Amino acid sequence: MFPPRRLNVKYLRRLIWYVSSRLLVLCCVLGLMTMAFYFSMNATNVYIILKDGMAKRAQVVMMGAEEELTPYFSPAYLERDPQLVQARSGQSPYQAYYTITGFDHRISLDRFWCWPWEDTARATITERIPAIDGKIRPSAREAAAAAGMSTSAPKWQTTQYTVLLSRENGVWHIRNMTVVRLLDDQ
């Protein structure tokens, strides 16, 4: 004999709830995985932009190399970056007195946050250059001594920055950098 009709509806309702609850859990897990993927992708892209962009910036400041910085920085920020303005006006002590042949540039990403659906990101980074290879120019030896400069290149100030980045046409650019604090070299 067949069970009463009411019993069939009960089992059907249970089946629907079971399937729908599992689908909801599956959708939530897939959504979280998608968000984690995009967060990781943004974090990787931002780290590469910060690492390469800050290294090129230091190269321009120390070596006077006219590297193209627009792939990393917004043009508006390049016009108001104090170290770049000083270097481009010829007032950088690295360019005035020394011949810099290389340096060890390090960036540590202290904090980062960007929602996957936003086009702006904030990061806190620490920039340090523990070693600068270079020597004083023979023609600038007297001027450097008068300015109180040593024969070896001056140390780079280790600095912690808050960086604001924006994504334009799928490409991240550093839009603003604010000094959080100056750190002692360790």
Segments predicted by a language model, with ranges:
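Hydrophobic membrane-insertion alpha-helices, especially the h-region
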Residues: V19-S40
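Core segments of small alpha/beta cavity-forming domains
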Residues: A36-L109
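N-terminal Lys/Arg-rich, disordered targeting/topogenic segments
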Residues: M1-Y18
